[in-house]
């Protein structure tokens, strides 16, 4: 079993144990008592969403770095392959010695992109989000809206999540097996049913958090684009 798989399973078991024994709920209720000192519900939700975004920022930045690194590595590998067209026969797997050295050098330049780090970043985001969501559930908000309004917000959030996952869904329906399609459909149906039961405070927390992350993603992409352009110059 790979080290990344063992690490992932260990973190999942720790998280499940903490949730099953009530440790997460106890911490959330203790934190909710401090949040209740703020009388304004809008300030409460904004503070909780900003706190969640700030705690998730290191993992958020690393995952963006990984995404950009994968794109750069793919482009660099294509250029490397084109530069060896004259000395290598890729169809017959007749490769020159310098090609292997260039590929190794390319991989070494992106050695910070590791599956273990990626899984740790994803799990870190999931754990932080789960804890902050439990705090939102533990805080008694005074927001009251018609059920139709809450349903509309839930549908808006569902459409946003589907839009964010459009690339994965497109690949799944084009190249995925029947089992993966059925499994993904069952998970999506369960997730949609679960989100439709959210309270207005939980929905607003998710929407504010998503807006903060989208703004952060836009700023990061603009900053990385200008940095890359300046390096090219």
UniProtKB/Swiss-Prot annotation:
UniProt keyword Transmembrane, yes or no: yes
Subcellular location: Cell membrane
Transmembrane regions: 7-27, 46-66, 116-136, 145-165, 176-198, 203-220
Membrane topology according to the record: Multi-pass membrane protein
A biological process term (GO) from this entry: bacteriocin biosynthetic process
Keywords: Antibiotic biosynthesis, Bacteriocin biosynthesis, Cell membrane, Membrane, Transmembrane, Transmembrane helix
Major site of localization recorded for this protein: membrane
Gene induction: Transcription is highly induced by oxygen limitation and is under dual and independent control of Spo0A-AbrB and ResDE.
A Gene Ontology cellular-component term: plasma membrane
Function: Involved in the production of the bacteriocin subtilosin.
Protein name as catalogued: Antilisterial bacteriocin subtilosin biosynthesis protein AlbG
Gene: albG
